[in-house]
Regions:
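N-terminal active-site beta-alpha-beta segment that forms phosphate/nucleotide-binding
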Residues: 1-77
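Conserved phosphate- and dinucleotide-binding cores of soluble alpha/beta proteins
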Residues: 3-7, 58-218
Length: 218
């Protein structure tokens, strides 16, 4: 059983540690805000100028003037700070973000990431991802393992323009949890009911498998 988007986000949330400052990219990463583990305190950063982002609002608490970088309505927690983009990016470029969680079109076995441009589609530009991949201490990617045509998105070399080089540390896809190590993609966990052989078939890059691979707890 492949993981859905919320299950991917929930698994990524278990990577967070108490005291972390965390930036959530657009797409699946924004869902991580709903699954912060009990007993830890993390501060979520939105690059449009908010430190202290909370979970998504209910219909009763929604505020149309309060949005994240992806233009989704959000909440904020007590003690939050609002500031301009220059200050926000000074935090990023200064190396103050412990973990960045990004979506991606492609990731290579060396940790390269392509996350901003698809040929033939009009796009405004790379956005804040270029700063995040260069400055964050740790980068985790949330993504589907294959594209709509069933082709692998975990590659030997990216086919799309790069966002960053050798920067991704870990991937949580709908099929697996994978760590980028010397020599390729190291399989750490697999989605419930998904075999190692299925993951290998869906991975173009070199998949490293050591011993028994546990299932992801969902």
């Amino acid at each position: 059983m492949a993981l859905d988007k919320n299950q991917i986000a929930k698994r990524i949330a278990r990577e967070l540690k108490d005291g972390y400052y965390v930036n959530l990219g657009i797409g699946i990463p924004t869902l991580v805000a709903n699954y912060i583990p009990e007993g830890i305190s993390v501060t979520l950063h939105s690059e449009n100028g908010l430190l202290g982002m909370g979970p998504f609002p209910t219909t009763e608490t929604v505020d149309a003037d309060l949005i994240n970088a992806g233009k989704q309505t959000i909440t904020y927690l007590p003690g939050s700070s609002f500031f301009d983009s220059a200050t926000s990016f000074a935090m990023i470029r200064g190396g103050h973000v412990d973990i960045t969680i990004l979506g991606a079109f492609e990731v290579t076995e060396k940790g390269d990431i392509a996350s901003w441009k698809v040929p033939g589609k009009l796009i405004k530009g790379m956005g804040g991802a270029m700063d995040l991949v260069a400055s964050a201490k740790n980068i985790i990617v949330a993504m589907q393992h294959t594209n709509k045509e069933g082709q692998s998105k975990l590659l030997k070399e990216c086919t799309l323009p790069l966002t960053g080089v050798a920067c991704v540390k870990k991937i949580v896809s709908d099929l697996a949890v994978i760590e980028i190590v010397e020599g390729g993609f190291k399989l750490l966990e697999r989605a419930p009911g998904v075999s190692v052989e299925q993951i290998r078939a869906a991975t173009e890059g070199n998949l490293i498998v050591e011993g028994e691979i546990p299932e992801i707890i969902v």
